[in-house]
Regions:
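C-terminal binding/interaction regions
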Residues: 1-64, 69-86, 91-168
Length: 168
């Protein structure tokens, strides 16, 4: 994928009509093409909390396993959570969780794919966000000061707007 920077002066708001009212974009005439996107985020926590997750010693159980499933489930329900997002048939969703002692915390990366007339970025970022929220929920008994950070779309491909890779 190659990086593409959007020039704010060229940007148009596709989800607003001429009067500025929100509307759902009609993608019916757009060809179905392969679309892929990835997203990432992290949750920072106390080192002791990270150790509890690593040792699977939190009262709610397998934090990473539940967060992975929650992210996948969330991607499938994105159009119910984001008002103007089209429901699309996902062909793939992946949620990876990595324990990071240097953070300290958990880094989440997600990917999603579809063959559709609209992109899959929202599904990737919703998967990442809900995986992080689930980690918070499952570990809050040990650490209420956890902070979710740096949630973003990291890449997308397919569609008329071209490929995008977020700057590192």
């Amino acid at each position: 994928m190659s990086a593409r920077n959007s020039d704010a002066s060229d940007a148009t708001l596709t989800h607003a009509d001429a009067s500025g009212a929100a509307r759902m974009v009609d993608v019916g005439a757009k060809p179905a093409t392969e679309r892929r996107a990835s997203a990432a985020g992290a949750i920072r926590m106390q080192p002791a909390t990270l150790e509890l997750i690593r040792a699977n010693q939190l009262a709610k159980g397998d934090v990473l396993g539940v967060a992975r499933i929650a992210g996948i489930m969330a991607a499938k329900r994105t159009s119910e959570l984001v008002p103007l997002c089209h429901p699309i048939a996902l062909t793939h969703v992946d949620v990876e969780l990595v324990l990071d002692d240097a953070l300290p915390g958990v880094r989440v990366t997600t990917s999603a794919a579809t063959v559709a007339g609209t992109g899959v970025e929202m599904e990737a970022i919703v998967a990442a966000t809900i995986a992080l929220v689930t980690i918070y929920d499952m570990a809050k008994s040990a650490d209420r000061a956890m902070v979710m950070e740096d949630v973003r779309v990291t890449a997308k491909s397919g569609g008329r707007s071209g490929d995008f890779v977020a700057p590192t």
